[in-house]
Amino acid sequence: MNASLTPNETTVQNVKLLIDGEWVESQTTEWHDIVNPATQQVLAKVPFATASEVDAAISAAHRAFQTWKLTPIGARMRIMLKLQALIREHSKRIAAVLSAEQGKTIADAEGDIFRGLEVVEHACSIGTLQMGEFAENVAGGVDTYTLRQPI
């Protein structure tokens, strides 16, 4: 999405696919408009990925998991802490995008972001739950259960 989200925006961005760590243009002929329900302005176009693009993404995810599952818990936690910091740093922009995409008020969008941030904060501490635990109310009305088992 464009950073400004101005009402006079004339260029509609085609969203790229993230496959194997790279942003790639889709080869699809089918696109879905992301429309601001309040203004009917088309904000972006999202591709309906082709079968080969889906296969490539699945294959890349499978390869990535082979190393991710060997990543120490502390390193995983640092990645989640970085995500937490990025959400906090960019929360106003994320709220603006969410508001435009869903027609929510900024206050509603900020509330959604805060709720998501609560889940990310819980994920930051997931390493302490590796023995398997049930945690109640990690976010308003959200409980989590962790179970350590090989995949």
What is each residue range found by the language model?
Residues M1-K45, R78, G132-I151:
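Terminal low-complexity tails and localization/encapsulation signals of metabolic enzymes
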Residues L43-Q130:
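Glycine-rich loop-to-alpha-helix module at the N-terminal edge of alpha/beta enzyme cores
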